[in-house]
Amino acid sequence: MVKLADIPEYERNHLMSKLLPPLGELPWVANNKPLSEKKVAIITTAGLNFRQDSNFEFADSSYRALPRDLSSSDILMTHASVNYDRSGFQEDINVVFPIDRFKELESEGVIGRLADVNYSFMGGGMLPDVYEANVRDLAKLLKADGVDAAFILPVCPNCSRTVC
């Protein structure tokens, strides 16, 4: 990830102007089983979608489902930002969506199982409340699927400010 000091001043000022409201108390989640028994989902902010699914649009807070067995060649990056560097994704999808690494962790017994369906949002610096309804919807899907943990992968400075 690029360091804030390494990006142009106008972009750095834009990022720093996005004040985030306090999120309040964090809900306590009991960690009642080891990682080796947990079902884990990957959630990325890279703006990825299945080739036949709808592309992400500007200021899009929705998410796309990415089945675990989907071929990398069928996954597109339709992130709307013109400032978004796609070169890492073009070389190796695992840079923004570490699906192969998690399959390896599963086969090594480090995690119990990778979820059958994983997800992508398109980051881009919108405030967290813009995503809230869709995140709550996704949380219900993850819970219904028996997911115990999610690996959330913000892939740019704007995404990091939104997710964190």
What are the residue ranges of the model-derived segments?
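An N-terminal assembly and electron-transfer interface module characteristic of large anaerobic redox
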Residues: 1-164
